[in-house]
Amino acid sequence: MAKLSPLTLIFIAACLSRILQLTILSGLSKALPLFDTSPSLLLSSPPPALRWDAIHFASVAYNGYEYEQQVAFQPGWLAVMRLAGEGVRFIRAASVVELKDVILGGTIVANVAFVAATLVLYKLTKHIFNPTFAFLTSLLYLLPPTATPSAPYTEPIYSLLTFSGIYLLSIKRQMVLAGLCFAGATTIRSTGIFNSITLMCFAVFGDAHIFDLDPKDYCKIRKKLKPFLSAILVVAPFFMFQHYTETVFCTRELKRASTARPWCSNSPPVSYGFVQKLYWNVGPFEYWTVSQLPNFALAMPILFFSLAGVVKFFSHLVSSSQVLNHGTEEIPPPPILFELYSVHVLTMALLLFTSHTQITLRVCLGDPVVWWNAVKLGFDNVQIGEAPTGQVKVNKFGRYWIGWTVVWGAVAAVLWAGHYPPA
């Protein structure tokens, strides 16, 4: 019998994880009454996928943007859900697409995207680190502390586009295709604009380490147009959508009647920050209240591993840049990691200081650094290189991470099925 490749094993495991979680959620949704009946506002018998933000996604994908609070969501995923719903309608030979088609189509795409994202993460990690490190990363990725990979949520397809962009950029050197993937990620989630940092830094530094650059090189950067064009490509979808919201909510008629929304008078008239703060209580330290301490506690494992991983990485980066001074042979990390860790720091800071911090549990799906940190800190004898030096063993941090993701993943499935908080 032929031995299966690691990539094939990851594919099988990813598919089984989707089947298992979907089956569990289906069973739980039949056994548990809804704590919050919001899903019933759309369908009398809502499927287990229709919970929390999926309610908004399905509504906009089916009816379009109707209310101001809905513009907090980028249009990319909603368009994909609508298109997938049309596909379901076509398969069942119906004349009109129904809401349940949109929900089912979105659920299918999200689950397929999660499997694909896992495979791309493996290939990306294999090239940056080594096959063993990549295999461990992928296995941990299949134990997410959230039920959202089984629902029509933004995270699976955002992760696929982000991982694909990083892979195309750092491994295949396809800057245009990478930029398109990153731009696609921005149409899904506004945090996709952070990928412009990765693209711009790669355009500037290439394979050079930031500490190896001569001061004269920085002067040359200002004369280069390519890095800035790359960044514009990635952030363009966000500002294009802001322009769309302006044309809808800031018409001349509304301004003359003094009924235009307050943000219409801003310069520029950007709705995003206003809507996030008014309807979702998102803003600097808005979430820092005593009542939200349990939600901070939920995200603490990821935040802890992120802090420890960031300190370890940048310490390694600085020490490896001083090889000549110390007379050591320490291997510096691949240049692309500097950009990715920088984006990781910005993402974690955003989640900690301005967002609903517990969404870290699902946003982490689109950040490869989270999973690399988990492997680096949770396993002994794993590092950058061709192969591990010695037997790879899980340590106490690894046991804690795996135990936490398994236990909380199970709890999250129950909470999701019954539409219990936290979201």
Curated annotation (Swiss-Prot):
Its main location: endoplasmic reticulum. One of its GO terms (molecular function) is alpha-1,6-mannosyltransferase activity. Pathway: Glycolipid biosynthesis; glycosylphosphatidylinositol-anchor biosynthesis. InterPro entries: PIG-V/Gpi18 (IPR007315). Its EC number is 2.4.1.-. It is found in: Endoplasmic reticulum membrane. The chain crosses the membrane at residues 7-27, 102-122, 128-148, 151-171, 191-211, 228-248, 298-318, 333-353, 400-420. Pfam families: Mannosyl_trans2. This is GPI mannosyltransferase 2. The gene is GPI18.
